[in-house]
A protein has these predicted regions:
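OB-fold/S1-family single-stranded nucleic acid-binding modules
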Residues: 56-73, 218-219
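Nucleic-acid nuclease catalytic cores
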Residues: 137-147, 154-186, 208
Length: 226
C-alpha cells in the first residue's frame, strides 16, 4: 500500500490517544495519530515521524502520523495498514493461490473477523493483528492489553472446532524481524489463548514488511514463538 504527500517531522508530545504535536517546517502542528495504542516506546520526544497530508479540507487536522523512526528502524504505526496490506497480498495470491474471493468484516459467532477467504476447500477465516512492538530484533504482541484480541482468538478456535480453516495472521509493521511471540508480560491471557488455539487447529502465521515512509508491503514469513 502507498501513501501520498508524505512529510518528515519531529515529534514533540502526545496529549491524548488521538492527536500529537510535531514540529514541521519550524512550526508546531497538531496531527492525527493513526494508532490509539500507547506506543510509548515509539513516540519519544525528538524522534523523527512521518506524516501523510489529508485530502479532506474540512478535517480538524491536516496530517496523519503514520510512521516513526526508532533508532535506525523505521516502523509503520498506522493501525489501518495491516488489513489493507493483507487484503492486497491475499488478492495477489500471496496467502494462497486458490483464494477465489475475499470478504472483509465477516460475522462469525459473536464477533466480526477481519476476513473470510473463499477457497475450493470452503471458507477460511482470518483475523489480522498489526505488530509494532520491537525488542532486540524480535517482535511482541500486544503492546497493551486487548480483550478484543482474546475474543477473536476464541472465535477462531470455535471456527476450527466447527471444521473451518482459521488463521491468526500477524502483520509485523517492521522489516528484518527475527521472530514474534505473545507478550506474556503485558497480557498473559492473550498468550494462553493463542497457545490453546494453536493446539486446537488454529494456524498462527506472521510476516514482516518492507517499510518506507510512503509504502508498506508484506515481505516474508517470520517464526512465531509460542
Amino acid at each position: 500500500m502507498h501513501y501520498q504527500n508524505v512529510r518528515a517531522a519531529k515529534f514533540i508530545d502526545r496529549p491524548n490517544r488521538f492527536i500529537a504535536h510535531v514540529e514541521l517546517d519550524g512550526s508546531v502542528e497538531t496531527v492525527h495519530v493513526k494508532n490509539t495504542g500507547r506506543c510509548r516506546e515509539l513516540l519519544v520526544p525528538g524522534c523523527t515521524v512521518y506524516l501523510e497530508k489529508g485530502t479532506n479540507p474540512n478535517r480538524k487536522t491536516a496530517y496523519d502520523l503514520i510512521a516513526v523512526e526508532k533508532g535506525s528502524i523505521l516502523i509503520n504505526m498506522d493501525a489501518q495498514a495491516p488489513n489493507k496490506v493483507f487484503h492486497e497480498w491475499a488478492a495477489s495470491g500471496g496467502f494462497a493461490p486458490e483464494v477465489t474471493a475475499i470478504r472483509p468484516e465477516y460475522a462469525y459467532g459473536g464477533s466480526r473477523l477481519d476476513f473470510c477467504l473463499e477457497t475450493p476447500r470452503g471458507p477460511h477465516l482470518v483475523e489480522v493483528k498489526g505488530v509494532t512492538l520491537e525488542e532486540n530484533g524480535n517482535a511482541l504482541f500486544p503492546d497493551a492489553p486487548t480483550e478484543r484480541g482474546v475474543r477473536h482468538i476464541r472465535e477462531l478456535q470455535r471456527a476450527a472446532a466447527d471444521g473451518l480453516d482459521a488463521t491468526l495472521f500477524f502483520v509485523i509493521q517492521i522489516k528484518n524481524i527475527a521472530s514474534v511471540a505473545p507478550n506474556d508480560a503485558t497480557q498473559p491471557d492473550f498468550g494462553s489463548a493463542l497457545r490453546d488455539a494453536a493446539a486446537h487447529g488454529v494456524r498462527v502465521l506472521a510476516y514482516d514488511c518492507d517499510v518506507a515512509p510512503d509504502c508498506l508491503t508484506i515481505r516474508r514469513e517470520v517464526p512465531v514463538i509460542l
